[in-house]
A protein has these predicted regions:
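ATP-binding/phosphotransfer module of carbohydrate and carboxylate kinases, centering on a glycine-rich
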Residues: 1-68, 124-130, 177-321
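Short beta-strand-loop/turn "lid" adjacent to the catalytic site in phosphate-handling enzymes
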Residues: 55-96, 104-105, 113-114, 123-126
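Glycine-rich phosphate-binding loop of actin/hexokinase-like ATP-binding domains
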Residues: 128-186
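Glycine/charged-rich beta-loop-alpha catalytic/anionic-binding loops adjacent to active sites
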Residues: 102-106, 150-158, 290-299
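A short glycine/serine-rich beta->alpha loop
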Residues: 36-38, 78-79, 156-164, 297-302
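Active-site neighborhood for divalent-cation/phosphate handling
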Residues: 101-133, 144-152
Length: 321
């Protein structure tokens, strides 16, 4: 029996799945973040090693140093350029050579697959390698691949340069609308009251204290998108316009990916991933209606599997290639 590791490494945590050649998950391990560009190589390597060890410990099989693990796929945040891939492959090889991985043989270079976290999200979401992943959580990005293996990325430029249609984008637009109404220069909206109540503020001027002086980051601000979503679901016109604008941005990015990968006669799947899609304002439904107009044969789906499972599938593909 052959085994593989599938690893999903992000800025918050690292997940490793131990899978067999029949695509059965035998073990799962979690550790800290593994974005080497923000943490450094050593800390990223430690998180990956720990996630692997924990996956093996949780496996329902007898595990020893002779476990026949033949391939590994690491889908990591911030990995996209050839240089990034070389760096990750090097430190995985280093883990093998220092005997810090419980494997019976050194992996061939082709069996150390390194790709972006978007790629494994697509494969995990659809269960195969073709289609489009529309990811909208704290940030946003669209990533697709066609049946010929051509890939297309749209967006993903971060909260300063991009991330249109993301939770952060929605939250910032909502906060700005609330403050404009508070100033008397904006359209009336219940967002002002909702933010004030949710954050426990005496007035909206205290937002300065919350956002700037408490050192709120992108993730904390993005969490406020739920307030905008709820206000839109309750019929607030300003909030609804913000949600519509966010969906329009995601549609534009998706349309760009489609035009670069598929033609009008092809059927393919579009998987929606991230917290924005699960709100009360029916972002998913709005998105589906718009997609049907630009890609009639496309099917919008929810993720079938998690990204780490997608990494495992890519590792298995490496064995069969």
């Amino acid at each position: 029996m052959s085994y593989v590791f599938g690893i999903d490494g992000g800025g918050t945590k690292t997940i490793c799945l131990l899978m067999d050649e029949n695509k059965i998950v035998l073990g799962r391990g979690e550790a800290g973040p593994s974005n080497y560009q923000t943490l450094g190589i050593e800390k990223a390597k430690q998180s990956i090693q720990l996630a692997i060890e924990r996956a093996i410990l949780s496996a329902n099989i007898k595990v020893d140093r002779h476990l026949n693990i033949e391939a590994i796929c690491l889908g990591l945040a911030g990995v996209g350029r050839p240089k990034d891939i070389e760096i990750v492959q090097f430190f995985v090889q280093n883990l093998q050579l220092t005997h810090n991985l419980p494997i019976s043989q050194l992996w061939q270079p082709k069996n150390i697959v390194v790709c972006s976290d978007c790629a494994i999200a697509l494969v995990g979401g659809t269960g195969h390698s073709s289609g489009i992943a529309v990811i909208s959580g704290t940030g946003s990005i669209v990533f697709g691949q066609n049946r010929q293996g051509k890939t297309k990325r749209v967006g993903g430029w971060g909260y300063i340069l991009g991330d249109e249609g993301s939770g952060y984008d929605i939250a910032i637009r909502g906060l700005q609308a609330a403050l404009k109404f508070y100033d008397g220069r904006g359209t009336p909206t219940i967002l002002a009251e909702k933010f004030q109540v949710y954050l426990g503020l005496k007035n909206l001027e205290e937002l300065v204290e919350v956002v700037y002086r408490r050192g709120w980051g992108v993730k904390e601000i993005a969490g406020l998108s739920l307030i905008v979503d709820r206000a839109a679901a309750e019929g607030d016109r300003v909030a609804d316009d913000i949600i519509n604008s966010a969906v329009a941005e995601l549609i534009w990015a998706t349309k760009t990916a489609i035009s670069g990968l598929f033609n009008q006669t092809e059927d393919f799947e579009i998987v929606t991933i991230g917290g924005v899609w699960g709100g009360e304002a029916n972002c998913r439904g709005r998105f589906e209606v718009a997609v049907s107009a630009i890609a009639p044969l496309a099917q919008v789906i929810s993720p079938r599997y998690e990204p780490a499972f997608g990494a495992g599938l890519l590792a298995l593909n490496a064995l069969n290639s």
